[in-house]
Amino acid sequence: MTKAIRVRYAPSPTGLLHIGNARTALFNYLYARHYGGTFIIRIEDTDRKRHVEDGERSQLENLRWLGIDWDESPETHENYRQSERLDMYQKYVNELLDKGLAYKSYVTEEELAAERERQEAAGETPRYINEYLGMSEEEKAAYIAEREAAGIIPTVRLAVNETGVYKWTDIVKGEIEFEGGNIGGDWVIQKKDGYPTYNFAVVIDDHLMEISHVIRGDDHIANTPKQLMVYEALGWEAPEFGHMTLIINSETGKKLSKRDTNTLQFIEDYRKKGYLPEAVFNFIALLGWNPGGEHEIFSRQELIELFDEKRLSKSPAAFDQKKLDWMNNEYIKNADFDTIFALAKPYLEEAGRLTDKAEKLVELYKPQMKSVDEIVPLTDLFFADFPELTDAEREVMAGETVPTVLTAFKEKLEAMSDADFVTENIFPQIKAVQKETGIKGKNLFMPIRIAVSGEMHGPELPDTIYLLGREKSIQHIENMLNQIQ
């Protein structure tokens, strides 16, 4: 590429970092790093009604947690928040007004709503009808004077070229074209409060920041022709555009919605649950992009090297929670113990389970964790009440040799001293029961496991018995014998 690559992620500080926005940031980051370009963070805070206190800090903090870094941002550069650039926007509003390419509009919200209602009732596509249509210059001046005398504050609208055609070659979707007559009429570029609208401000920002490529979600496709109109009106060259497909819920096939409370959708949620940032980064990178091949686990550097915008998918990206859980489990299994133990400690401490056996518990359950917060329910066996048996477990415990196995193993545990009661000495006791009773395989191990833990599956049986403790293991076996005899 001969053009200097400059891309941006431009969030509105209206809440937490959604996984869709995180994907936008991540793909722009990969694009910049792959081509040796510049990645910029710009804060689009012109929608004051939706502004959330601390929203900007939350966005940046969660991006950092993911491992996304940037070259330019409000932290290092002046006027990288739209609210700091109002004079700049005003300059270009004035330029368009002076050229006759924009005009002040005094139509009220009530009048717009009434006209929209009339159009819908008539089966027409709602659009703005120029309020000055058919007026002479004298009538226009009188209309403006009357409106201003009534205290009506105008907006500024861009005069749309209804016969114009606005097209671009999309990086993801190929050729896209809109006719000027289908945009909805002249549209507002400056609101009554003096703030620019999104589609105007973003053009000024992207041009002045020399953005070369705009990579964003395909919900912005309808915004692009309006932005191209502003580029045209100001005589500027537009950047290249790429619109990523929407993210759908793999279970419902519907667009991932923030209202879907059954799906974790905010990066903050994954942080709190103990997902590893490397796993979440890896997972998001594969939402709508495929490097080819069957391999799915990639380091950040591998993703940077492999990234190719030509492999961005035209089909919706499926958000599969089970796949993310699998991927996170792979990262947890391969992470060093100290990292996982440090992450697990706060969960254990909050649950009152940070005992002298905590390290052994984390070591035992590390391979099973889909998220680090699962260390608490996984260790219920050692701290909570004995669980109610399932029908399958009851069926096992109804076997005729079960009392023999449990009685023999209980006697072995009772004969062990506290000093002898260590993990490596427990398995030989089980083998001794096998030798004495002639009972082996599942008929030997399964009754002991269920009697001790209340579960058919779990960590290695000697580890489970050791962590439960000799006295508690004996007590559980006695309780089970009382139930089945």
Curated annotation (Swiss-Prot):
Predominant subcellular localization, coarse grouping: cytoplasm
Entry's localization field: Cytoplasm
GO BP annotations, alphabetical order: glutamyl-tRNA aminoacylation
Keywords annotated in UniProt: Aminoacyl-tRNA synthetase, ATP-binding, Cytoplasm, Ligase, Nucleotide-binding, Protein biosynthesis
Entry's EC annotation: 6.1.1.17
Residue pairs linked by disulfide bridges in the UniProt entry: none
An annotated Gene Ontology molecular function: zinc ion binding
Classification via HAMAP family: Glu_tRNA_synth_type1
Family to which the UniProt record says this protein belongs: Belongs to the class-I aminoacyl-tRNA synthetase family. Glutamate--tRNA ligase type 1 subfamily.
Subunit: Monomer.
NCBIfam families per UniProt: gltX_bact
Protein name: Glutamate--tRNA ligase
Organism taxonomic ancestry: Bacteria, Bacillati, Bacillota, Bacilli, Lactobacillales
Gene name tied to this protein: gltX
